[in-house]
């Protein structure tokens, strides 16, 4: 097998590939690459979570794009990581566990917020040449870190953080967590347990008939390993089951156990909305009512520019919303069928159901496109 060549970023690589025009003046005048300022970042609240969006006009934003493309994506990761990786997906996170007799899902509490910036520096330093970028004032690694970290005004006690919402944060989280993935994977291998991770979600399965994954011992061991890097388990999201487990709308079931092959399917709740939408369309319920009631889409009055054309605008809006919703769900279901064709792990009865839903969706899309009346 061909070994992937280790990447090493040096001053020339930074200037010609990563920075380009972004900090050209700093390079010429030999002034340090600055940290990301508060005026370059917008804070977005979503429930109890805070996301950070860097302005597209920020030079750091352009550096982040190139860091992802030319640097971070070339750093090797642990095989357990299934999110934020090329070819990764939620289904690939679930698929290794179809042989399980018992299951355990653990959630890492405040995943991004608890990534230590010291661990970020330690994890990236082997791939960045130990040299100065600006005279003897700023090391190359510090210049790069200034483009991926942020001193949040609402988390001053943390210093520099890897903000949830920065385009480089997902890749960096996998790189930093690689050490932890390896420790957990090694522990699980000794116990005959399968492990995979999707961002902050960790899934474990045991092919053998055993109560290990439901024991305090197992949870304590994983907790102990996570604590090495300052991570904790979110106890409220702990799930352990035998024969079948439902996670985020997906169900893994293996009634046979003892290493037999199980299957994956979508839960009834995951399909509930699209089935209600297609049923409502079959009953010729107005598009506006369907959008308002089932997909929770409602046209705001302020978005209607011309009162005289309100009815026409509203009809087109809800028609387009339905087409977009059905088209998106159609693509999603097709991805399940394609995944099954490669991995043979989706429940066969469910594949039949999917094909029926796909046929209904396609017929409704065609009808909506032809129909110009509500």
Curated annotation (Swiss-Prot):
Residues reported to bind Mg(2+): 107, 200-201
Pfam families from the UniProt entry: RVT_1
EC identifiers of the protein: 2.7.7.49
Listed InterPro entries: DNA/RNA_pol_sf, GrpII_Intron_Splice-Mob/Def, Reverse_transcriptase_msDNA, RT_dom
Catalytic reactions of this protein: DNA(n) + a 2'-deoxyribonucleoside 5'-triphosphate = DNA(n+1) + diphosphate
A GO MF label: RNA-directed DNA polymerase activity
Keyword vocabulary terms for this entry: Antiviral defense, Magnesium, Metal-binding, Nucleotidyltransferase, RNA-binding, RNA-directed DNA polymerase, Transferase
Transmembrane among keywords: no
Ranges of residues in domain Reverse transcriptase: 25-252
Top-level taxon: Bacteria
GO biological process: one example: defense response to virus
Described function: Reverse transcriptase (RT) component of antiviral defense system retron Eco8, composed of this RT, the following endonuclease and a non-coding RNA (ncRNA) encoded between them. Expression of retron Eco8 confers protection against bacteriophages T4, T6, T7 and SECphi4, SECphi6 and SECphi18. At multiplicity of infection (MOI) of 0.02 cultures slow growth when infected with SECphi4 but do not collapse, at MOI 2 cultures collapse. Responsible for synthesis of msDNA (a branched molecule with RNA linked by a 2',5'-phosphodiester bond to ssDNA).
Homology family: Belongs to the bacterial reverse transcriptase family.
Protein name: Retron Eco8 reverse transcriptase
Taxonomy of the source species: Bacteria, Pseudomonadati, Pseudomonadota, Gammaproteobacteria, Enterobacterales
